[in-house]
Design a protein with these regions (language model features):
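Metal-dependent amide/peptide-bond hydrolase catalytic core
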Residues: 106, 286-422
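Soluble non-cytosolic domains of exported or imported proteins
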Residues: 70-74, 87-98, 169, 173, ...
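Acidic/His- and Gly-rich active-site-bordering loop/insert found
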Residues: 59-167, 177-194
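Divalent metal-coordination and catalytic microenvironments
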Residues: 83, 121, 134, 172, ...
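Bacterial Sec-dependent N-terminal signal peptides
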Residues: 1-4, 8-63
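Extracytoplasmic/secreted proteins, especially bacterial periplasmic and envelope-associated proteins
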Residues: 64, 71, 75-78, 82, ...
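Histidine/acidic-residue-rich, glycine-tolerant segments that coordinate divalent metal ions
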Residues: 156-167, 173-174, 185-186, 191-304, ...
C-alpha cells in the first residue's frame, strides 16, 4: 500500500481450514485459510485471513483436509520468518521470486516470471470450473527494523542515494507465506479443485522506483491475467490496527485512487532587498497550496466520495537573501470515484494556471496516476458473504467497513476482471 502500516512483532501461528456451504443463490464457494498470529509483546491473537475462492467446491470437505492444512503450519511459519529476515525492495525482489518460483515448481505447479520479479503459478484442478486468481504482494520497504526478534531484518541497501535498512513493515512477508501455504494445500487436493487457480505473487506494490515500470500494471500488461483468462481475482491485506478475529469488507469503491503530482512555478529571480524587480515563485506557491484546499472544501461534492489533496514536498532557493527563479512542489491526490478523480485533475490544472498568471508567473502541472480506485464487485461480494461469515465465526465478526483513503495497485486487476479485496 502507498502508506506504511507498522505491524506488531509476530511469532508463531496456527492454520485452520473452514468448510463452506453452498449459498442458496450462488455456486460460489470459498476455501478459507485462517492464520492465527500471536503477538509477542501483547500476547494477543491477530486473526489474518487469506481467501482462496473456488467455484462449486464440494459442500463437505473430508476431515483429512483439515489435517492437511494444519500440517502445513510449521512450513508457513518458516517461510514467513525467512522472508521477514530477507526483505527486498520494489523491483529488486530477485531472491524472493526465485524461492517462490522454485517452490511452486516443486509442487508441480506451472510457474513463470512476470514483471521482472513477479511470479505467476497455475494450478489446473481435476474438475471443470472457472479461473480464479489469488494475489499476494512481495516487496518490502526502506525502513530500519529495531527489535530483538531472532528473525529481524538486518538488510541494508542504497535507496535514493542513501544507505537505508530494508524491512517487511507492511506485512507482505505474511502475504507471501500465506499464499505459498495455500498453493501447497491446493496442490495436494488438486483432484478436488473445480477449475483453475492462478497464484499472483506481485512485486513492487509499494511503487516501482523512479521511472521504472512495475507492480500490478506491469503484471497486467505482461499477461498475468490472460493465459489462462482469469474470471475473478481475490486479494487481501493484514491490518494490525483493526479488531482481532474480524473480517472487514465493503462492496463497491473500497480504497482510494492515488495520483502523484508535480507543480513547477517559474518566476523571476531578484535580490531579497528588491522584490519588486522579480516575481517570487515562493509567494505564488503558497497561494497555490492554499487554494488547492478550496478545491476539496468548496468545489467537490463530498457527499459523493472523499477527496484529499496533499502537498508533501516543496523546494525553492539556495540563499536566504535571493528570491529564486523557480519553486517545485510535489503531492498526492486521493479520490474514491473515477469521475471525481478526473474532475480534480482538471481543477488543479486550472487553479495553478490562473493563480500563476495573476502574479505574472507561469506554472506547469504533471499528474501521474499510480493506482485506480479499488472497486469490490458488489455481486461477487454478495456471493461470498456466507462463506466469509462462516470463516469469521459468526455474523458479528463479519464487519461492513468504510472507505479507505489508502491506495492499492490491486485496483488494476479489478479493471480487468471482477475482484474483491478484503
Amino acid at each position: 500500500m502507498h502508506y506504511v502500516k507498522f505491524l506488531a512483532s509476530t511469532g508463531d501461528f496456527s492454520l485452520e481450514l473452514v468448510r463452506s456451504k453452498k449459498t442458496p443463490d450462488s455456486q460460489l464457494q470459498t476455501l478459507l485459510c485462517i492464520f492465527l498470529f500471536q503477538t509477542q509483546p501483547m500476547r494477543k491473537t491477530l486473526l489474518l485471513l487469506f481467501v482462496c475462492p473456488l467455484f462449486s467446491l464440494a459442500q463437505n470437505l473430508p476431515a483429512s483436509y483439515d489435517d492437511l492444512v494444519k500440517s502445513e503450519t510449521p512450513k508457513v511459519v518458516e517461510w514467513r520468518r525467512y522472508f521477514h529476515a530477507n526483505p527486498e525492495l520494489s523491483n529488486r525482489e530477485f531472491n524472493t521470486s526465485k524461492k517462490i518460483e522454485a517452490y511452486l515448481k516443486e509442487l508441480g505447479i506451472d510457474a513463470r516470471i512476470v514483471a521482472n520479479t513477479g511470479v505467476v503459478g497455475i494450478l489446473k484442478g481435476g474438475k471443470p470450473g472457472p479461473v480464479v486468481a489469488l494475489r499476494a504482494d512481495i516487496d518490502a520497504l526502506p525502513v530500519t527494523e529495531r527489535n530483538t526478534l531472532s528473525f529481524k531484518s538486518n538488510v541494508t541497501t542504497d535507496y535514493n542515494g542513501q544507505k537505508v535498512g530494508v524491512m517487511h513493515a507492511c506485512g507482505h512477508d505474511s502475504h507471501i507465506a500465506m499464499l505459498m501455504g495455500t498453493a501447497e494445500v491446493l496442490s495436494k487436493m488438486k483432484n478436488d479443485v473445480p477449475g483453475t487457480v492462478v497464484f499472483l505473487f506481485q512485486p513492487a506494490e509499494e511503487g516501482p522506483p523512479g521511472t521504472e515500470e512495475g507492480g500490478a500494471p506491469l503484471m497486467v500488461k505482461q499477461g498475468a491475467l490472460d493465459n489462462p483468462k482469469v474470471d475473478v481475482v481475490f486479494g487481501m491485506h493484514i491490518e494490525a490496527g483493526l479488531d482481532l478475529g474480524k473480517i472487514y469488507y465493503k462492496p463497491g469503491a473500497f480504497m482510494a485512487s492515488s495520483d502523484w503530482f508535480t507543480i513547477k512555478v517559474k518566476g523571476k529571480q531578484s535580490h531579497g532587498a528588491d522584490p519588486w524587480k522579480g516575481i517570487d515563485p515562493i509567494v505564488v506557491s503558497s497561494e497555490i497550496i492554499q487554494n488547492l484546499q478550496t478545491i476539496v472544501s468548496r468545489q467537490m461534492d463530498l457527499t459523493t466520495a472523499p477527496v484529499i489533496i496533499t502537498v508533501g514536498k516543496i523546494n525553492a532557493g539556495v540563499r536566504p537573501n535571493i528570491i529564486p527563479e523557480e519553486a517545485v512542489m510535489e503531492g498526492t491526490i486521493r479520490t474514491l470515484d473515477g469521475k471525481m478523480q478526473k474532475e480534480v485533475h482538471e481543477r488543479i490544472r486550472n487553479t495553478v494556471k490562473n493563480i500563476a498568471a495573476v502574479y505574472g508567473a507561469t506554472a506547469e502541472v504533471t499528474i501521474d496516476t499510480k493506482t485506480l480506485v479499488t472497486y469490490n464487485d458488489p455481486k461477487l461480494v454478495a456471493q461470498s458473504l456466507a462463506s466469509l461469515q462462516k470463516a469469521a465465526g459468526g455474523e458479528n465478526n463479519l464487519v461492513p467497513y468504510h472507505w479507505v483513503t489508502g491506495a492499492e495497485d490491486f485496483s488494476f486487476y479489478g479493471n480487468k476482471a471482477p475482484a474483491i479485496f478484503f
